[in-house]
Amino acid sequence: MVDYQFYQNMVDVIIPDVLRSIPNALTQAIRNFAKNLEIWLCESMVGVPERLSQIKTSAVSAFCQTLRRYTSLNHLAQAARAVLQNSSQIAQMLNDLNRVDFHNVQEQAAWVCQCETSVVQRLENDFKAALQQQSSLEQWATWLQLVVDSALEEYRGKPNYAKAARQFLLKWSFYSSMVIRDLTLRSASSFGSFHLIRLLYDEYMFYLVEHKIAEAQQKTAIAVICDRMRTSIGLEFDYQLEFIDDNIESGSAAKRMKHE
């Protein structure tokens, strides 16, 4: 669809690199633009056929959501960059991470996510090595890209690629949450730093997977986001209908009992 390509081009121009520092004034301007664009479009579409209006509105909604997400991701990236450049904080993080019970984490990950022990072990070792080397944010981003590529390689060109990609996100999130849980229980001094890093890496993983799915489906990322939004709205609508039907049936049953 032309609208998707147009808005994707706009995203690529406005935020060409989600990790590169953006001035605060520009970030605020982008957010204000995203906040008002949908309103402006709706006002300009008065009298337009409903179907055309829905198509235009869904595309611009995906565009605005993308701008909001990418500016939030960029904000996290700049906050995390400060942590990753602080050698004393990195040393504390490595010290706290070495106390985590990774054997327990791996056992639970294997049971819940069916993650291979060798893969989980490799991720642990790579993460610790990157901390020890005081890797830059860009180096971390390269590693995350390699993790995604490695995890999805066997599904390349297969019809279940998108499903596998979403499953990978769930597994990644569960595994990282187990590590954060252990750090919390141990009252780790660097918990705040780990929490920030985890937020950034989760969001960046989502960003990477979204683009991998778009590439596999030969679509723009905006189109993938729009598809997801439509699916979400459809599920919510189905739930509402089911809720209404249940209430109607309950009401009818109550009336019958009353008459009886």
State what each model feature region is.
Residues 35, 56, 128, 158, ...:
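Context-gated lysine
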Residues 15, 19, 42, 72, ...:
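Short amphipathic alpha-helices and their capping/turn residues within compact interaction modules
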Residues 3, 12, 17, 96, ...:
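Acidic-enriched, low-complexity/disordered segments with a strong bias for Aspartate over Glutamate
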Residues 1-122, 131-142, 166:
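C-terminal, extended alpha-helical scaffolding domains
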Residues 168-171, 175-260:
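Eukaryotic terminal intrinsically disordered regions
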Residues 49, 120-165, 181-186:
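Extended amphipathic alpha-helical scaffold segments
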Residues 32, 143-146, 171-174, 178:
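Charged, amphipathic alpha-helical oligomerization/scaffolding segments
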